[in-house]
């Protein structure tokens, strides 16, 4: 008889679970022992040689990962033993697996579950790189029971908060992670085991410094920290911020002759700034069957170049990617470019680090990178995993020498190539035509120009970035703009100062700057930086003349002769300016208040008579402009006066001051005070009595009106018949006047015609109703039917 396939008995099931648990414990202890016995100095070639758990090994095999790269072979062993690591390797060398495998293995050996909380935190500088790391984690960790999450900006914060407490592994960007640490109440990181920083040098620089410091402040100090990047930092301050404990520095290609992959061909082109767009267009037209990434320094440039080339239709799909786009759009563009065989992607540095776009043929750097590390990360988007790739760098003649020195220091081999003149196509006329027809494109061009100049201006390496040597007018023309937009932050010759400077001032300043031999200084001293507080303390009233003007006039108000000034300056002592006159007033024999109008007119000064007694002296252009504004002239006019008229029609001012003699003639001040108080007391008492009498009369009239209304209501209710007032007969006209006087007074209003209602339908007014129930009145019998109904009721 065949064995039964039914459910096992309780005893057999319990024993099988016990055996399974025991077997798992034995496997875990064996794995732990293998990790402890691992020889770090030995070089391993495949993942099967490493002490990995069964779920991790199965995930690697399913994802077709078999052979170890150099960084993986040297870093995974240290990480499995729980040491802190600083990992540095070339781009495309497999650094992602070098930290994801230790994360899975360390949590697996500790039998981590969702009840233990967050076990590993992986920080990435960009959203796209975080998404890529999360996808790799899903592939190799598909057989594990850990819960992993992706925390980036652009997603719903509330949905992330609901699921965050159940996560064991988190891949995130610094900004969003700090937001959850500060705002999510149920999110705890006290039990964190591992902290991983991918592209650590970028995360630790000034852009993320405060954010990373705040995140590290929330984390426990007893943890394992892994730092990986193509250009690793060794600064003691950065390592101290992360509380690294005796870190192991793993640099695979430190002794290599090149910091970039050997399969990468690197070239640079020296082209003026105004010809970069023409060279880029010619390159794209010559490589329509290639996959290219073009790096620019700002998002405004990316948008302008993308929109311009899209209108020109080069014959290849164009895409653009920058940080101002929505997260959904960024993901779509990343996926489309990864799947495309032939395309051009215009991008900022958000795609320069870590992203793995398959089969990229060219990397074009239209703008010079800020340093050699940025250059290495940009060109690392091609020639990945031992594949071929090519990179081209566009340099302005002023940037060539400085940038080549920086690349040489980083062991970057690069060669110069020249462009054939017959292959280059100019698109300047087309861009000018498009900017003329499309105001939005012109606006984008202006913003692109400003953002590029600003990006050059803020660079620290002034040996490479020399803003004054760039031909900005030609660059603006190459963008299709009619002229270079004004940029406020560029320091140069102040046109306003040169416009307002007078010849005499320039002559005096030239004499002051000349040395004893008579030779003038060729260059003025650079001005020191003046803050807003300096300007606040240097501020003076507008009616005080400037120092240079006070030096041009003599004590008598006449202008200084320049020839005499030059000769006198030679004999003057250096300390003559110790007690210098700030402003001179023309004081004569009269009062110091000012000169008469005749004297001012003789000196050529214009005097304007305003409404009233005041006069306005026009001695400057500011005063001339003042005459055009009525509002500003009000402060120079006298205050208006208000007149009142007495009963006799005489005009008096609103407030007239009494003469002191008249006041004394009326007696002592205290007697006047007492008399005034008595008069005012009597006046107020009389007025109070009058007010009380008026109030009493009003109350009496109100009471009489109320009683009259009540009488009228009673008279209307007692009326038994319908009464209509009709016009009088002719005989009534014969009544005598005496009879009319005896009649009742005529009402003020015309009486309305009222018809009395029958008694059956009349209701008793509310004030006449009794609280006791009224007896029912007998019904009146009017017809035979009423009599019959009454008899029927009595009999029945």
From Swiss-Prot:
<dbReference type="GO" id="GO:0042802">
    <property type="term" value="F:identical protein binding"/>
</dbReference>
<feature type="region of interest" description="Disordered">
    <location>
        <begin position="500"/>
        <end position="533"/>
    </location>
</feature>
<comment type="function">
    <text>ATP-dependent RNA helicase required for ribosome biogenesis. Involved in the release of U14 snoRNA in pre-ribosomal complexes. Required for pre-rRNA cleavage at site A2.</text>
</comment>
<keyword id="KW-0067">ATP-binding</keyword>
<keyword id="KW-0694">RNA-binding</keyword>
<dbReference type="Pfam" id="PF13959">
    <property type="entry name" value="CTE_SPB4"/>
</dbReference>
<feature type="compositionally biased region" description="Basic and acidic residues">
    <location>
        <begin position="737"/>
        <end position="746"/>
    </location>
</feature>
<comment type="subunit">
    <text>Interacts with the U3 and U14 snoRNAs. Associates with pre-ribosomal complexes.</text>
</comment>
<feature type="domain" description="Helicase ATP-binding">
    <location>
        <begin position="76"/>
        <end position="250"/>
    </location>
</feature>
<dbReference type="InterPro" id="IPR000629">
    <property type="entry name" value="RNA-helicase_DEAD-box_CS"/>
</dbReference>
<comment type="similarity">
    <text>Belongs to the DEAD box helicase family. DDX10/DBP4 subfamily.</text>
</comment>
<dbReference type="InterPro" id="IPR027417">
    <property type="entry name" value="P-loop_NTPase"/>
</dbReference>
<dbReference type="GO" id="GO:0005730">
    <property type="term" value="C:nucleolus"/>
</dbReference>
<dbReference type="GO" id="GO:0006364">
    <property type="term" value="P:rRNA processing"/>
</dbReference>
<feature type="short sequence motif" description="Q motif">
    <location>
        <begin position="45"/>
        <end position="73"/>
    </location>
</feature>
<dbReference type="GO" id="GO:0016887">
    <property type="term" value="F:ATP hydrolysis activity"/>
</dbReference>
<feature type="region of interest" description="Disordered">
    <location>
        <begin position="1"/>
        <end position="28"/>
    </location>
</feature>
<dbReference type="Pfam" id="PF00270">
    <property type="entry name" value="DEAD"/>
</dbReference>
<feature type="compositionally biased region" description="Basic and acidic residues">
    <location>
        <begin position="517"/>
        <end position="533"/>
    </location>
</feature>
<dbReference type="InterPro" id="IPR014014">
    <property type="entry name" value="RNA_helicase_DEAD_Q_motif"/>
</dbReference>
<dbReference type="InterPro" id="IPR025313">
    <property type="entry name" value="SPB4-like_CTE"/>
</dbReference>
<keyword id="KW-0698">rRNA processing</keyword>
<keyword id="KW-0378">Hydrolase</keyword>
<feature type="region of interest" description="Disordered">
    <location>
        <begin position="556"/>
        <end position="575"/>
    </location>
</feature>
<keyword id="KW-0690">Ribosome biogenesis</keyword>
<dbReference type="InterPro" id="IPR014001">
    <property type="entry name" value="Helicase_ATP-bd"/>
</dbReference>
<dbReference type="GO" id="GO:0032040">
    <property type="term" value="C:small-subunit processome"/>
</dbReference>
<feature type="short sequence motif" description="DEAD box">
    <location>
        <begin position="198"/>
        <end position="201"/>
    </location>
</feature>
<dbReference type="InterPro" id="IPR001650">
    <property type="entry name" value="Helicase_C-like"/>
</dbReference>
<feature type="compositionally biased region" description="Basic and acidic residues">
    <location>
        <begin position="754"/>
        <end position="767"/>
    </location>
</feature>
<feature type="binding site">
    <location>
        <begin position="89"/>
        <end position="96"/>
    </location>
    <ligand>
        <name>ATP</name>
    </ligand>
</feature>
<dbReference type="GO" id="GO:0003724">
    <property type="term" value="F:RNA helicase activity"/>
</dbReference>
<dbReference type="GO" id="GO:0003723">
    <property type="term" value="F:RNA binding"/>
</dbReference>
<feature type="domain" description="Helicase C-terminal">
    <location>
        <begin position="272"/>
        <end position="435"/>
    </location>
</feature>
<feature type="compositionally biased region" description="Basic and acidic residues">
    <location>
        <begin position="663"/>
        <end position="696"/>
    </location>
</feature>
<keyword id="KW-0347">Helicase</keyword>
<protein>
    <recommendedName>
        <fullName>ATP-dependent RNA helicase dbp4</fullName>
        <ecNumber>3.6.4.13</ecNumber>
    </recommendedName>
</protein>
<dbReference type="GO" id="GO:0005524">
    <property type="term" value="F:ATP binding"/>
</dbReference>
<dbReference type="InterPro" id="IPR011545">
    <property type="entry name" value="DEAD/DEAH_box_helicase_dom"/>
</dbReference>
<feature type="compositionally biased region" description="Basic residues">
    <location>
        <begin position="697"/>
        <end position="706"/>
    </location>
</feature>
<keyword id="KW-0547">Nucleotide-binding</keyword>
<keyword id="KW-0539">Nucleus</keyword>
